[in-house]
């Protein structure tokens, strides 16, 4: 298993409870597929560098996980379907 860093941005027009639900849902997708979540950092609402889908702000979430490729692929597949997640980036952590 490799270490990955995942950052995704949730649309700012959602309630805090909806944000928590999205975070828990995608953490569960990872753990159900054999990943180990090392760290969850809810950075919070920040200004975007440029507008994405007419949003100027977004709720940032940063994950550090140890996972296999299948777990990451399933996470990517499911998170890209969700319209409330406006951007996602998965990178390998080489450390």
Curated annotation (Swiss-Prot):
Ranges in a coiled coil: none
Any Pfam family hit: Ribosomal_S6
Keywords, sorted A to Z: Ribonucleoprotein, Ribosomal protein, RNA-binding, rRNA-binding
GO biological process: translation
GO CC terms in record: cytoplasm; ribonucleoprotein complex; ribosome
SUPFAM superfamilies per record: Ribosomal protein S6
Role, per record: Binds together with bS18 to 16S ribosomal RNA.
Similarity comment text for this entry: Belongs to the bacterial ribosomal protein bS6 family.
NCBIfam families reported for this sequence: S6
Name by which UniProt lists this protein: Small ribosomal subunit protein bS6
